[in-house]
Amino acid sequence: MPEPREPTPSIAARARGLGSARRGTGAWRAERVTAVALVPLTLWLVASLVALGGADRAAFVAWLGRPLPALLVILLLLAAFRHTALGLQVVIEDYVHSAAKIPLLITTYLLCFAICVVGVLATLSVAFRR
């Protein structure tokens, strides 16, 4: 007669001692919101650039000088770099297990922020230059 097996511990029992899961829900939700926002914004940008296909610089500047395209490009930049920062944060937190984790996270956020600011300022510069 086989020996009785011990019951398999529940998921909650196996997760005890691994820390709180509350902190990650906001980042998880933000990553999903930015991903959903990026879909229509990216499709719009691709369609707009295809429509501008053979246009010269003056036509592009005139297009970006309109309020709606400028706003949508800025929203795309904000969503893209927030999404990038969140995704890289997850990768760093999951795979870097050394003292380099915190400096890497700070560097990642600073770079994403700086590149986003440069993109937004460049968009505004083109949009308001007439």
Question: Regions from the language model: what does each represent?
Answer:
Residues 1-130:
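Membrane-embedded alpha-helical bundles that constitute the cytochrome b-like, heme-associated redox core
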